[in-house]
Design a protein with these regions (language model features):
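Conserved nucleotide-binding/hydrolysis micro-motifs of P-loop NTPases
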Residues: 28-31, 98-101, 130-131, 179-183, ...
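Motif I (Walker A/P-loop) of helicase-class P-loop NTPases
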Residues: 3-11
Length: 344
């Protein structure tokens, strides 16, 4: 619910007169594009051909947004962008926490005429605020040219702070993260605030978002009053023999001689059946994201043998089902799916 929460915050900010909203949406393009899409769908209402979201039609919608970035173009990709000229509409920017787009936004703000700039009321939302924004190089370093110690900051931290400085005093900065530990340890007092802008330490508040009624998280999976995992409806203990076989499967030399464990096969069938149930519920459910994670080792390279083994299994099942179970292993596969179906 993190994105939904700050989408609502953007809407409330616009209602209260904030006219420039900047979302710092992580370090990579895929997250930025995903966030841009969500905000166009759920905030601006410009994605009209969707099954979900809000849909704004007609001229009577008085708070129409001025969308600066697009799904395809981050801020630094935009050509011939004029300085801010009209603040009657709330402006929306979704950008990566990279040096180039942050520099371009500061240049764009600095190029705005002073009589308009003084009326900017900006909300900066830092998504994944513990990733990229933290000053990981904070401290003094020796400068051999000047023969003295100088403070230095990591590049993204510097650019985020310069962005806040360019908008000062008319801005609010709100960070969102599931893991705020690093943010708590940010130095609240910096010596270079005048030149680089304020510290990103959460001076004013740190709050936990309220869980929705249908939320399933750590408190539901591992409740405090639960004596063991055996009491949980969400956890199935992997048999020790299966766990040993999974560990063997990451070894290329032993892969061909190691079958996929029964518990993993059952989990894959359960996943396929659950997906079939969702698809049968209609297009709206079938189009939703649906994934399964198989996690044996922490590195991608060591997981590749298991990926190949699982893909071979799925390809074999697909051919068997396409032949309407007429292949030699057809009756056995059908019986296995039926067994899992009746179990779950």
């Amino acid at each position: 619910g993190k994105t939904s929460n700050y989408t609502a915050l953007c809407a409330k900010a616009a209602d209260y007169g904030y006219n420039l909203i900047i979302i710092l949406s992580g370090l990579f393009n895929d997250l930025r594009e995903q966030t841009q899409f969500r905000l166009l769908k759920e905030l601006a209402g410009t994605e009209k051909d969707l099954l979900e979201g809000i849909h704004i039609h007609g001229e009577n919608y008085k708070k129409q947004w001025k969308i600066i970035t697009t799904k395809e173009k981050d801020f630094h990709d935009l050509k011939y962008l004029k300085s801010i000229g009209d603040l009657t509409q709330p402006h929306l920017i979704v950008t990566k926490k990279n040096v180039t787009p942050l520099e371009k936004i500061v240049e764009w703000i600095d190029s705005t005429p002073s009589d308009i700039r003084k009326d900017i009321r900006a909300l900066i939302i830092d998504d994944e605020a513990d990733h990229g924004s933290i000053d990981t190089q904070s401290g003094e370093q020796w400068n051999s040219s000047s023969n003295e110690f100088e403070t230095s900051e990591s590049e993204i931290n510097r650019r985020v702070r310069l962005l806040l400085k360019s908008l000062s005093p008319g801005f609010a900065y709100v960070g969102y993260t599931a893991t705020p530990i690093a943010n708590i340890f940010i130095n609240p007092e910096v010596d270079n605030e005048v030149t680089l802008g304020p510290s990103l330490y959460p001076n004013d508040f740190i709050i936990t978002l309220q869980e929705p009624d249908d939320y399933c998280g750590i408190n539901q999976i591992f409740p405090a009053n639960q004596e063991s995992n055996e009491d949980s409806p969400y956890i199935i203990q992997v048999p020790e023999l299966d766990a040993d076989n999974l560990r063997l499967m990451v070894d290329e030399e032993k892969l061909d001689h190691t079958p996929i464990p029964d518990s993993l096969e059952e989990a894959i069938i359960t996943y396929i059946l659950s997906w079939a149930i969702r698809c049968s519920a209609g297009r709206k459910q079938g189009n939703k994201h649906h994934s399964m994670l198989i996690h044996v080792k922490h590195t991608t390279e060591t997981m590749k043998p298991i990926v190949r083994k699982v893909n071979d299994l799925l390809n074999n099942w697909s051919l068997t089902i396409a032949d309407e179970y007429e292949r030699v292993d057809g009756p056995k596969l059908r019986g296995r799916f039926k067994q899992v179906w009746e179990k779950v």
